[in-house]
């Protein structure tokens, strides 16, 4: 994958890299080991405020759910920035998403596309990754 100016690419997409949220418990936003960075789970926080509440396919539409997943992905990039330069990212290895849905909700993978599609928009085909998407109630 070619080097990408992440902030410039985000600006082209009408987005910007947020400031990483402060941890609310005994963990760090991200940790680096060698050339790998692992991020903590992220919520759809914008300037410290939840961007959405509710269950998908209940109070939150599928379209809005994808937007919230994109916000979580942006927050992951902000977490990376606490331990490494996001412009040095050369590969997205794995994405895991937990989607709060109504009982019987089966479209968690569609929601998590909001994150995957952001990474693909930034890094192109080089951002193809393994992924798990879980629906939780």
Model-identified regions with their sequence ranges:
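Short, polar/acidic, helix-capping and beta-turn segments at strand->helix junctions
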Residues: 1-137
């Amino acid at each position: 994958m070619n080097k990408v100016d992440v902030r410039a690419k985000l600006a082209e997409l009408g987005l910007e890299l947020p400031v990483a949220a402060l941890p609310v418990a005994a963990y760090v936003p991200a940790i680096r080991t060698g050339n790998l960075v692992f991020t903590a789970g992220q919520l759809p926080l914008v300037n410290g405020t939840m961007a959405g509440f509710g269950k998908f396919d209940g109070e939150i539409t599928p379209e809005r759910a994808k937007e919230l997943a994109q916000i979580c992905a942006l927050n992951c990039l902000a977490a990376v920035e606490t331990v490494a330069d996001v412009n040095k990212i050369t590969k997205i290895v794995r994405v895991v998403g937990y989607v709060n849905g109504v009982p019987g909700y089966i479209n968690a993978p569609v929601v998590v596309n909001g994150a995957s599609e952001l990474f693909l928009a930034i890094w192109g085909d080089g951002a193809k990754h393994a992924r798990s998407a879980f629906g939780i109630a």
